[in-house]
Amino acid sequence: MTAPSQVLKIRRPDDWHVHLRDGDMLKTVVPYTSEIYGRAIVMPNLASPITTVDAAIAYRQRILDAVPAGHDFTPLMTCYLTDSLDADELERGFHEGVFTAAKLYPANATTNSSHGVTSVDAIMPVLERMEKLGMPLLVHGEVTHAEVDIFDREARFIDTVMEPLRQRLTALKVVFEHITTKDAAQYVRDGNDYLAATITPQHLMFNRNDMLVGGIRPHLYCLPILKRNIHQQALRDLVASGFTRAFLGTDSAPHSRHRKETSCGCAGCFNAPSALGSYAAVFEEMNALAHFEAFCSLNGPQFYGLPVNTGWVELVRDEQQVPENIALADDSLVPFLAGETVRWSVKK
């Protein structure tokens, strides 16, 4: 029997979905991403959303100012779509290399999404412009109607929003972000080359029992919410198959400890410190390490039409404990898998 590999060497990966926040939080979390990833698609849902070219340029500079010396990292900026967004502004940002993609948040679907889109019809001229430009649309795929059960929001979104949109704009490039259900996995698998998906480590590693059985675990609470195990298994099967239109998107979403551990806690897992090793562990469990590099480093650039990174990253089989917390200006951050032992670590 062949001994398990002790080192995994892959092209430098990219994170195709990350929240870097702003202010002191940004300064704290950026290095965890910039150390490992060559590029990252940065979410625009700040308290004042990124809806203009100037705002994106200023935010990109704040991110770059927080990147430690020696880290080779490029933030890829996104535009927050609103009902009143100017299509000309979006096109200008895309042509000037400021906006890589635009993000569709259904209004009130997640953190800082109150400015989001009330209906796809309201932004159809913008989406038609994006289709012509070849500009990717990044979608938080959940309906937010009060009568829809939170565990059904993603499947309902496919039927009522995603499929009608893609039928109407057949050449629009769409990333179905952080998919969580067998419905979404099958939908993306059955789709054409204009449709891709990102998948988080938490949705591959855990299901709702892990969050709710034996006590509630607020640091596993994210949106879209963890689903039952049949959905988790469908996501695992998708990536283990070597499907090329699924790629790494951590959705790392930091909140201070007191905003997570409270009677009405915020959604989001701060997984940047341990995400790559977490993905490696999942692929190893599924005997799918042959597809690990493509998921992390090749599939995303292929969909976005970007070159792969030139550098390399090594992960070593070296059990390490994830810190219980990370210092923040007036509080602390509890990282994903805090206090737990992880099997794979990025070689420094």
Swiss-Prot record:
**UniProt binding sites for Zn(2+) 1:** H17, H19, K103, D251
Give the modified residues of type N6-carboxylysine.
K103
Its UniProt entry gives the catalysed reaction(s) as: (S)-dihydroorotate + H2O = N-carbamoyl-L-aspartate + H(+)
Membrane-spanning intervals of the chain: none
Say yes or no: keyword Lipoprotein present: no
Does RNA-binding count among this protein's keywords?
no
Q: Which GO terms describe its biological process?
A: 'de novo' pyrimidine nucleobase biosynthetic process; 'de novo' UMP biosynthetic process
Which controlled-vocabulary keywords does the entry list? Hydrolase, Metal-binding, Pyrimidine biosynthesis, Zinc
**Name recorded for this polypeptide:** Dihydroorotase
Q: Which gene encodes it?
A: pyrC
